[in-house]
Amino acid sequence: MFISVAVIVIAMILVVAPTGLWSYSPGEPEFEPVREVDPQAFIDNEARASAYDIYFPETPQDWVPNSARRKLIDGETSSVVGWVTAERGFIQIAQTGVPLAQALQKFDSKYRPNQEARQIVGREVTVKSSDDASVSRLWGVEKNGTTLLFDGVASDDEFTTIIANTLQADAYQPA
């Protein structure tokens, strides 16, 4: 058995190594640079195609945008932008036309039985969580027919900052 595993590993190394698609990087991943994306170009396109308002919040200068993509929430397309925060956390905002209660339930397959309400800039924000530490909190609020969902791993202050900035932002107007 050991010989067959060794043969497979050697064959894998011989086939993959020359392609350049293999890298070995010892050490902590937190020391690697964050790959930055241009979220404004993505939001510009999404605002043109969306049936609901899209919001592009101001973010602290030391936050780095690292993802912009689409995601299905309950069968409907949503726009998602994510940032690495100053404290090396991660927050993403998903914007959809799916009603809040439905979107909170269908955001992903994770079970979040706990629910609480928080006040942020005078608006009630729903926070769904789980006793399982591997399940991230999900924060949700509706604004002018758009459901805003925030998830990730970051401090309450960072979540409050991005949620407040989003709630205070005007609907994005494409260039």
How would you describe each model-predicted region?
Residues 115-175:
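A short, solvent-exposed beta-edge/loop patch
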Residues 21-36:
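Ser/Thr/Pro/Gly-rich low-complexity linker/stalk segments immediately outside membranes or between
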Residues 17, 42-46, 162-165:
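Residues that form generic nucleotide/phosphate-binding pockets
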Residues 21, 110-111, 166-169:
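Alpha-helix boundary/capping residues
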Residues 2-19:
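Hydrophobic membrane-insertion alpha-helices, especially the h-region
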Residues 34-130:
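Short, solvent-exposed recognition patches
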